[in-house]
């Protein structure tokens, strides 16, 4: 160290402005690895001359003073050993070694830190002896500039102090056996140590000191320029010495600190006070024995003891320091003190950044230590930097969302990687937290780069792989209570079922049928054929085989004659049953002209003409029935009946569709019509039908349980329940009248309310048609009875049904009759009374309707 240049007169003093506020840093100290060792750290008494002296008022609490201890004492009394006065091996305390020229005590600059609202646990420290010294012009200007900069860069200094402490502490570590002297010299116009440590511009950063001596001592002889200034400092008294316990072979870090809060003291530092009467002069720093203070570690804590060092003080050989004073730079010893001019003369805020740079000579000297210590120091330095940057990274850095389903969407992962490659990282060293913050702010404004085409292709591939084994047509899921319709359904049924979807099923209505729920296929599976359908298909196959075998025309003629005979056998019992009891009176009242009037029905013209020509043609075989007019029919076909049936069915269908649109559930419960052989037979057994309409051209299936047997069963149930049954319209025409695209064989009517006129007219026309059919049969029978014997065999089946009533010829008994013909004969006698009652009721109802119309 070197002395300053010319001084100003002592009368000139500078007082601090009231605007200047003290700043107490949160953490003060250098990170020095203190080793727990029983060896004492010898602190030479000559170093006391370079400490500013501040005295504390007496306190009530017990503290350890050096005068209370005997020289060479190794332990403290147990009552003084507490958690507040023991030193933790890692509790660091900064010290400053200043020359006497840098010590200025300004009146009125004492700050009280014992305010409970601001700093709890701080002790009140006042200067008992306020010493004023003249300041040079450079120091005045420097101080004014510093006070202005401190107010302006308050927050910046706080941040820099935290970072600088971490970097400096790592720089001053060296190999084992070497010593580092950290000298912090700042303007002593600031009376408190915390405010001094915040002033980064005037701080003196110590460089590496490599020495092999176990004891570090220095005197004023090494710095002759300082001896003259010591004469002016006779009034200044000793200050308490602060020092962390350290082994002899490790580093020594000395920093000046005037005030230390009790909270920091409790962490492991010990307060050592000297007698205020003690004083150290320049003569004490000579080769004579000097008084040193030692801090030694004991199981009870750290112990301070004063000893007399007999060794000669050795000047430090390698001391590199940074002094922020221009006048000292020239007079310092170049071998002992290395002062970079760029750092010593810097007073702008950039000086804080320059302090972080390690001097080249310092690097070369520090490299002489062991590599192990340097690795430790570098590792700790990295940890410090990571701690300082982690505060910002936690707040600002946010990871982008990860795409975990990389297997399902591989293109998304590729797009994200491509985007990460484009964005190159900037300022990876110190400005990385700030850049991360900026990137996060601007991330929402950047256009999102996603490969939508790749996403769509990936989804399509996944769907194709899933549905590869399934059918190409999708499955429709009906969420509600109404089933979903297929596109192929008819227009009328589609309208009705779509109306069902508007109104949900009422679960409280127990009479309502249950609606289908769940899944339904657009194209339903092929239903298994019923027993009736199986019989029909079987007979069709047999007929085809028979036609293939008998391809000759005589075979066809024989088949036709057999069909005609069987048709006559089937029809005449029915005709006898229906026309005998019901239409006898009408046959008498209506002559055979009605038979002529029904000759020209449009669709049945051929069979009607054949029936009309049977009377005059006595020589030919009487053929009444055909494929369009089956033998189960018991009435003559006419256009009037067909038109009346068509009007009735259309009206009932209109009523039913209107009800479905208003209330589908109610329309389902109160239906007007039912279609099909099986459904009609089912409701006939339940006695819910009021009328049955049968198509006259149903297919001929004579097997047991076949179509003919089912039709006869339906007619039988209708006769039992006195229900009128009408033969009208062929199958296709009957389906068209019901707005169906398929042919319909049988239709059952539940209720004809609203269409009574059409219904009664249909019944009247049906009764007349039966009478005409009965008259035709009587005429045919009379003609066949008067026929000679050769014509008897072909007429036997036609005369069979009427023989029981008229004592027919004995040839009838020789002919075998089918089983169902015998059943019809029995029904003829049993149902004669029922048919009469039905006829009377129909006549009464028609007469009432006529009276109402009048």
From Swiss-Prot:
InterPro entries hit by this protein: Ribosomal_eL30-like_sf, Ribosomal_eL8/eL30/eS12/Gad45, SECISBP2
Illness: Thyroid hormone metabolism, abnormal, 1: A disorder associated with a reduction in type II iodothyronine deiodinase activity.
Keyword vocabulary terms for this entry: Disease variant, Mitochondrion, Nucleus, Protein biosynthesis, RNA-binding, Transit peptide
Region feature (RNA-binding): 673-694
Gene Ontology annotations of biological process type: forebrain neuron development; mRNA stabilization; negative regulation of nuclear-transcribed mRNA catabolic process, nonsense-mediated decay; RNA catabolic process; selenocysteine incorporation; striatum development
Region (Disordered): 332-351, 356-394, 417-445, 488-619, 787-812
Biased segments, Polar residues type: 338-350, 361-372, 426-445, 548-559
GO cellular component terms, A-Z: mitochondrion; nucleoplasm; ribonucleoprotein complex
Function text: mRNA-binding protein that binds to the SECIS (selenocysteine insertion sequence) element present in the 3'-UTR of mRNAs encoding selenoproteins and facilitates the incorporation of the rare amino acid selenocysteine. Insertion of selenocysteine at UGA codons is mediated by SECISBP2 and EEFSEC: SECISBP2 (1) specifically binds the SECIS sequence once the 80S ribosome encounters an in-frame UGA codon and (2) contacts the RPS27A/eS31 of the 40S ribosome before ribosome stalling.
Compositional bias segments (type: Basic and acidic residues): 536-547, 593-611
Motif Nuclear localization signal boundaries: 380-387
Molecular function GO labels: DNA binding; mRNA 3'-UTR binding; ribonucleoprotein complex binding; RNA binding; selenocysteine insertion sequence binding
Tissue expression from the record: Expressed at high levels in testis.
SUPFAM superfamilies reported for this sequence: L30e-like (SSF55315)
Protein's name in the database: Selenocysteine insertion sequence-binding protein 2
Ranges of compositional bias, category Acidic residues: 560-572
């Amino acid at each position: 160290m070197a002395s300053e240049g010319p001084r100003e007169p002592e009368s000139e003093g500078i007082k601090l402005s009231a605007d200047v506020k003290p700043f107490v840093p949160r953490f003060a100290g250098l990170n020095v690895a203190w080793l727990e060792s029983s060896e004492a750290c010898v602190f030479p008494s000559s170093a006391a001359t370079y400490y500013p002296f501040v005295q504390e008022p007496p306190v009530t609490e017990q503290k350890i003073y050096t005068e209370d201890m005997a020289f060479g004492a190794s332990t403290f009394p147990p009552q003084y050993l507490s958690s507040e006065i023991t030193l933790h091996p890692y509790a660091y305390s900064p010290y400053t070694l200043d020359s006497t020229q840098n010590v200025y005590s300004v009146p009125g600059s004492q700050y009280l830190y014992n305010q409970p609202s601001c700093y709890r646990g701080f002790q009140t420290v006042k200067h008992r002896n306020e010493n004023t010294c003249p300041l040079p012009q450079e120091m005045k200007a420097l101080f004014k500039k510093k006070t202005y900069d401190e107010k302006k860069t308050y927050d910046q200094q706080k941040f820099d102090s935290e970072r600088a402490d971490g970097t400096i502490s790592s720089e001053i570590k060296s190999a084992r056996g070497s010593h580092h002297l950290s000298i912090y010299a700042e303007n002593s116009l600031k009376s408190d140590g915390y405010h001094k440590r915040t002033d980064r511009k005037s701080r003196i950063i110590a460089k590496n000191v490599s020495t092999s001596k176990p004891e570090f001592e220095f005197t004023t002889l090494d710095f002759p320029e300082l001896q003259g200034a010591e004469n002016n400092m006779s009034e200044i008294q000793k200050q308490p010495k602060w020092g962390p316990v350290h082994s002899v072979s490790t580093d020594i870090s000395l920093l000046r600190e005037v005030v230390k809060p009790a909270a920091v003291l409790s962490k492991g530092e010990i307060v050592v006070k000297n007698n205020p009467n003690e004083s150290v002069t320049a003569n004490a720093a000579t080769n004579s024995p000097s008084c040193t203070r030692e801090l030694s570690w004991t199981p009870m804590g750290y112990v301070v003891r004063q000893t007399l060092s007999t060794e000669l003080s050795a000047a430090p050989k390698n001391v590199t320091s940074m002094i922020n004073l221009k006048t000292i730079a020239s007079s310092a010893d170049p071998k002992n003190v290395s002062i970079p001019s760029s750092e010593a003369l810097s007073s702008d805020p950039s000086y804080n950044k320059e302090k972080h740079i390690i001097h080249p000579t310092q690097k070369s000297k520090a490299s002489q230590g062991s590599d192990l210590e340097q690795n430790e120091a570098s590792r700790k330095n990295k940890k410090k930097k990571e701690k300082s940057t982690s505060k910002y990274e936690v707040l600002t850095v946010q990871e982008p969302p990860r795409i975990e389903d990389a297997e399902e969407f591989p293109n998304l992962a590729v797009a994200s990687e491509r985007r990460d490659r484009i964005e190159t990282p900037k300022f990876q060293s110190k400005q990385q937290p700030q850049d991360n913050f900026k990137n996060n702010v601007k991330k929402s404004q950047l256009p999102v780069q996603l490969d939508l085409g790749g996403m769509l292709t990936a989804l399509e591939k996944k769907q194709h792989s899933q549905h590869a084994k399934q059918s190409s047509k999708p499955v429709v899921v009906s969420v509600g209570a109404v089933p979903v319709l297929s596109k192929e359904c008819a227009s009328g049924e589609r309208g009705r079922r779509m109306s069902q979807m508007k109104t949900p099923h009422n679960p409280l209505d127990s009479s309502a049928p249950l609606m289908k729920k769940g899944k339904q296929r657009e194209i339903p599976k092929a239903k298994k054929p019923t027993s009736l359908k199986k019989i029909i298909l079987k007979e069709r196959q047999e007929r085809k085989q028979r036609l293939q075998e008998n391809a000759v025309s005589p075979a066809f003629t024989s088949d036709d004659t057999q069909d005609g005979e069987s048709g006559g056998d089937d029809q005449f019992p029915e005709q006898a049953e229906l026309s005998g009891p019901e239409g006898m009176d009408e046959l008498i009242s209506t002559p055979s002209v009605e038979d002529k009037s029904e000759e020209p029905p449009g669709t049945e013209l051929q069979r009607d003409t054949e029936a009309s020509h049977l009377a005059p043609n006595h020589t030919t075989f009487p053929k009444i029935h055909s494929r369009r007019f089956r033998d189960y029919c018991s009435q003559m076909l006419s256009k009037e009946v067909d038109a009346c049936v068509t009007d009735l069915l259309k009206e009932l269908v209109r009523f039913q569709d209107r009800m479905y649109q208003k209330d589908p559930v109610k329309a389902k419960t109160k239906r007007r019509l039912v279609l099909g052989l099986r459904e009609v037979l089912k409701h006939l057994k339940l006695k819910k039908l009021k009328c049955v309409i049968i198509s006259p051209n149903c297919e001929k299936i004579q097997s047991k349980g076949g179509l003919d047997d089912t039709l006869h069963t339906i007619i039988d149930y209708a006769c039992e329940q006195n229900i009128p049954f009408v033969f009208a319209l062929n199958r296709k025409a009957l389906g068209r009248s019901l707005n169906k695209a398929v042919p319909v064989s049988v239709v059952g009517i539940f209720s004809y309310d609203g269409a009574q006129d059409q219904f009664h007219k249909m019944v009247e026309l049906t009764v007349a048609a039966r009478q005409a059919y009965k008259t035709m049969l009587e005429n045919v029978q009379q003609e066949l009875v008067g026929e000679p014997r050769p014509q008897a065999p072909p007429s036997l089946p036609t005369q069979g049904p009427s023989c029981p009533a008229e004592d027919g010829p004995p040839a009838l008994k020789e002919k075998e009759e089918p089983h169902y013909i015998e059943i019809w004969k029995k029904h003829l006698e049993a149902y004669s009374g029922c048919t009469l009652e039905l006829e009377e009721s129909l006549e009464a109802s028609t007469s009432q309707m006529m009276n109402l119309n009048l």
